[in-house]
Amino acid sequence: MSKFFVLGTYSPESYEGFIKNPEQDRKALAQALAKAMNAEITGMDFLRGSYDFIATIEANNFEDLAAVKLTFEATRAGKMTILESVDINEIAKKAGTAMSNYVPPASN
């Protein structure tokens, strides 16, 4: 499983729904959507600021989480930004290999 972070904003229609039914459990509904793609929300918080929520999600791959995003956005619930956790040490090792085989453009 890969670890992802999702930052999201809700649409005006979603806010209208919250006002009409302030008791709805948005975390449970989000978890059900994630589970449909064999993903699991391991943490979710609502925020003040540029984003309305942040979630930590474990999923098999990016495509499964992208399907969740498409569903969320297609229903006009809001917008999501998916960020994937990476192994920076492994990336640095690969960059070292790439660098040893790269010739930068000559500067004039």
Question: Each PLM stretch: what is its role?
Answer:
Residues 1-108:
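A compositional/biophysical signature of low hydrophobicity enriched in polar/charged and small residues
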